[in-house]
């Protein structure tokens, strides 16, 4: 049986992710207490090959039992994987304001929305380290659905490299394992003919390809990864998120992510995410 445990902060997009899993053939269960997971799996094991269960702070402190539950499930032959969705405080508060919904912890925590978000983040901190983290702060629902479907294709027995572009003016991705700053490189934004384009467009690629510093920057990151990937593998990582940032996340970071993904794609599992492209 394939089991995906979907957890994360309220407002981070779990409903969207759960629907994406359902659309790909998973039997989904929303907001199941962690203490009931093993019993549910035992009940439906014979009839369902792919199951996705959403778990969040509404289940209370029983979520602390999740790490041990995962170990038991894996030992019993269940292929258990964890996705953890998160976002920064400002993005979460904005989403609750837009939907005019109270935070699930509002009746238990005083101090307003931000206090509730921080308490939930504390409650789920250990769970965040169990699986693949996705920062949805500046990600729209369609992009998140794409991320989930790409992640499902990953062979969990091998380390996956997730190359992610972003703009520093929108904040550093909180799910990044490694962050590289490409703002020191020439910026196509200042060429009026390139300003509206992205790092995927041929004219921008030609502009950046012509600069030796860009090539050295990419070579240095690639060399670092080649040198240290064996250590990350020995650390039993399921995925390694390498975030490349420029000012707006439109030109330089996008180009570098595409170049790195192409270099490593023939030998490694590669995921590409452009966080700040529309």
Regions found by a protein language model. Give the residues of each.
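C-terminal accessory "lid"/substrate-recognition subdomains
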Residues: 114-242, 276-278
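Conserved nucleotide-sensing/catalytic segment adjacent to the nucleotide-binding pocket
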Residues: 24-73
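Post-Walker A alpha-helix
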Residues: 17-18, 257
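Switch/connector loops and helix/strand junctions flanking conserved nucleotide-binding motifs
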Residues: 61-63, 89-96, 104, 142-143, ...
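Hydrophobic anchor at the beta1->P-loop junction of P-loop NTPases
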Residues: 6, 242-246
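Post-Walker A helix-loop "phosphate-sensing" segment adjacent to the P-loop in P-loop NTPases
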Residues: 22-31, 261-270
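The conserved Walker
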Residues: 10, 248
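Conserved glycine(s) of the Walker
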Residues: 13, 251-252
